[in-house]
C-alpha cells in the first residue's frame, strides 16, 4: 500500500492504492519511488536490509529512506516518526478488518489465537495481537505460501443454499425435508462430476436463522 499526504488535509494516509510487485516499493529498485508500507518496515529495521529476499533480491534501504522522507517532509516530522506513522495507520486498518470478522460477528478476539500469514503478515502480526488482545500469535512455516498450501491440500467441497422469507412455524416439515434433499443433490452434482464417488460424500446442513425484527443471522 502506498502512503501519501493529501494536499488539502496534510494528514497522512495509507492505501488503498498499491505499488504492486512492479514497480513495487522503492526498496525493490524496479522503478518505484513512492513510499509504501514495505519501505516503512525497512526504514524501521523490521524488514532487514542486509538480507536478500528469496535469496537473490537485494533490498535498497537508501531508496526506502528517500521515499519515506517525502512523507516526513509533507507532515513536518522526522524520518523514523514518519515510518512509524505509516505502520501505525496500516495496523489500525488491518485491525478494523479483524473486527469485521470477529467482534461484529459476535466473536470475542480474546478467545482466539491470531495466525499471521501472507508475505508481510508476520511483520504486523504481533501489533495486531496487541490491538485485538489475541494470543498467542502464531507464525506458520512459509507464511507467504500458506494460502496456496491450503488450496492445494483442502478437501473438495461445494455448497447450495435457499432462503425462506417466512416464520419458522409456517414452513411445513414435508417442504423443509424436500428442500434439504434438493439442496443435497445440487451440492453433490459438481463433486460427482469431478470424480468424487457418492459413497465418499459427506453432507452437512446448517441453518442461519433470526428472531422477528433481527437484522442479521
PLM regions: where:
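N-terminally biased helix-coil "hinge/interface" segments that flank
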Residues: 1-217
Amino acid at each position: 500500500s502506498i502512503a501519501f499526504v493529501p494536499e488539502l488535509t496534510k494528514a497522512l494516509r495509507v492505501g488503498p492504492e498499491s505499488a504492486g510487485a512492479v514497480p513495487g516499493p522503492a526498496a525493490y529498485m524496479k522503478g518505484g519511488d513512492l513510499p509504501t508500507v514495505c519501505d516503512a518496515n525497512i526504514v524501521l529495521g523490521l524488514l532487514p536490509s542486509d538480507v536478500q529476499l528469496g535469496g537473490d533480491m537485494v533490498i535498497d534501504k537508501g531508496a526506502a529512506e528517500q521515499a519515506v522522507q517525502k512523507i516526513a517532509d509533507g507532515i513536518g516530522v522526522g524520518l523514523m516518526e514518519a515510518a512509524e506513522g505509516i505502520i501505525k495507520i496500516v495496523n489500525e486498518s488491518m485491525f478494523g478488518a479483524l473486527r469485521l470478522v470477529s467482534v461484529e460477528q459476535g466473536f470475542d478476539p480474546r478467545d482466539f489465537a491470531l495466525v499471521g500469514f501472507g508475505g508481510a503478515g508476520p511483520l504486523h502480526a504481533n501489533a495486531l495481537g496487541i490491538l485485538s488482545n489475541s494470543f498467542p500469535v502464531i507464525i506458520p512455516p512459509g507464511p507467504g505460501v500458506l494460502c496456496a498450501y491450503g488450496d492445494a491440500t483442502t478437501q473438495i467441497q461445494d455448497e447450495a443454499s435457499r432462503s425462506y422469507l417466512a416464520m419458522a412455524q409456517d414452513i411445513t416439515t414435508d417442504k423443509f425435508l424436500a428442500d434439504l434433499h434438493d439442496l443435497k443433490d445440487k451440492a453433490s452434482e459438481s463433486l460427482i462430476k469431478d470424480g468424487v464417488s457418492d459413497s465418499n460424500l459427506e453432507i452437512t446442513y446448517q441453518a442461519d436463522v433470526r428472531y422477528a425484527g433481527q437484522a442479521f443471522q
